[in-house]
């Protein structure tokens, strides 16, 4: 492998670049392509879904049924899994369920002198469509991080879509789907899968809301169907921003950057070094690990084309850069870091401490790893139980006499 070509930039240069929004994901060229895919599936249903999948993903499906898996199929695949994998999946399942059960979403019921009941009630969204990313790698954890939360919320029907992959990877995804309580699974990915969830086909039922991360095409498809169906967010390629004041010992931090970069060539990695020194040793460690990594080519492209390595003077400058990015994952390695500072950071998820990593949070902590990307952390949040619920306002008046206490007048129209 050729030498890793990554450069460091100063605080002023990084700030100017980020203020111009050049680091945000640009998917303008995808819009028309995705629009045509959605219209095709919406109009032609199963036929379009099969044709697009066979063309893009090189599958050989003749019917949607060939790519469909019911509860019995999912159980059979779970039984094929290695016991160690089952143990790991069940460990993660327990943590996710325990975390989200601890989030309280109680109904509100009150009254006043006019209304005998004023309040809001919660009910689960009935039909959920879940997308689990794939392609060069598969992510069974994405199934657990969404489906289990939907189950805690009480959703009745949960349908999973994931891209075509090897038989071994497919068995893992389908087995995980069984553990997560999936109703049906479909071996379709990309914008056409989102369209099938949003509008349904002859075989696939329409979803009320779509969840799950994906690539640029998936994010753009979710953007275009929003309004006809609910979505969790426009999550795109994986992101990590690391703030560190370490001066030596970069093995773990290099691995953390690589863990995000290996998701795809469009993954974004930012490293902010507080104080002088450090980056040179980090670059050497990255070079070593990328050379040894199984997906070194993908990692190298992500680090060279979509990443930034920034030297700043202090934590204040680091916070400023971070908040211009609003990353999906933020790791903070800073001596004597104070918890009171956490609310100053804009990020989808924050991982504090040298022994804590985004990977740990993504797979085993408990909170969902479906997190806002592309600066959306400024106005949105990670997927949680509230996202699988709808609130309805409720009022009740028992006595007609109470109506006389309501004073409503027609607003005066301005004269012209």
State what each model feature region is.
Residues 406-416:
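Single conserved hydrophobic/aromatic residue that forms the stacking wall/gate
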Residues 266-382:
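NAD(P)-dependent aldehyde/semialdehyde dehydrogenase
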Residues 110-175:
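Conserved small-residue-rich beta-alpha loop and adjacent elements
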């Amino acid at each position: 492998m050729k030498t890793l070509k990554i450069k460091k930039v100063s605080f002023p240069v990084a700030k100017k670049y980020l203020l111009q929004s050049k680091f945000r994901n640009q998917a303008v060229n995808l819009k028309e392509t995705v629009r045509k895919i959605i219209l095709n599936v919406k109009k032609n249903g199963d036929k379009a879904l099969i044709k697009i999948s066979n063309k893009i993903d090189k599958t050989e499906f003749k019917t949607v049924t060939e790519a469909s898996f019911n509860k019995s199929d999912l159980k059979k695949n779970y039984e094929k899994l290695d016991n160690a994998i089952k143990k790991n999946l069940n460990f993660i399942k327990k943590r996710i369920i325990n975390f989200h059960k601890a989030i309280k979403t109680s109904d509100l019921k009150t009254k006043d002198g006019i209304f005998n009941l004023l309040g809001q009630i919660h009910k689960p969204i009935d039909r959920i469509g879940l997308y689990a990313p794939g392609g060069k790698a598969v992510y069974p954890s994405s199934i657990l991080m969404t489906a289990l939360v939907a189950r805690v919320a009480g959703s009745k029907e949960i349908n999973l879509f994931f891209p075509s992959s090897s038989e071994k990877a497919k068995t893992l995804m389908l087995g995980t789907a069984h553990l997560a309580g999936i109703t049906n699974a479909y071996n379709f990915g990309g914008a056409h899968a989102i369209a099938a969830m949003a509008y349904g086909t002859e075989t696939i039922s329409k979803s009320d809301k779509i969840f799950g991360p994906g690539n640029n095409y998936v994010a753009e498809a979710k953007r275009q169907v929003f309004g006809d169906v609910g979505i969790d967010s426009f999550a795109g390629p994986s992101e990590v921003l690391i703030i560190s004041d370490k001066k030596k010992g970069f093995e773990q931090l290099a691995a953390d950057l690589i863990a995000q970069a290996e998701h795809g060539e469009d993954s974004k990695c930012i490293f902010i070094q507080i104080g002088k020194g450090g980056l040179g040793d980090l670059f050497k460690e990255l070079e070593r690990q990328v050379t040894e990594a199984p997906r070194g080519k993908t990692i190298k492209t992500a680090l060279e084309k979509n990443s930034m390595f920034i030297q700043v003077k202090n934590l204040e400058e680091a916070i400023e850069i971070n908040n211009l990015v609003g990353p999906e994952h933020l790791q903070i390695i800073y001596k004597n870091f104070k918890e009171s500072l956490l609310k100053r950071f804009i990020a989808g998820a924050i991982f504090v401490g040298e022994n804590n990593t985004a990977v740990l949070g993504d797979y085993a902590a408990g909170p969902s790893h479906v997190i806002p990307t592309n600066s959306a952390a400024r106005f949105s949040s990670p997927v949680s139980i509230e996202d699988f619920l709808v609130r309805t306002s409720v009022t009740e008046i028992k006595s007609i006499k109470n109506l006389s206490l309501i004073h409503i007048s027609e607003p005066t129209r301005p004269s012209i």
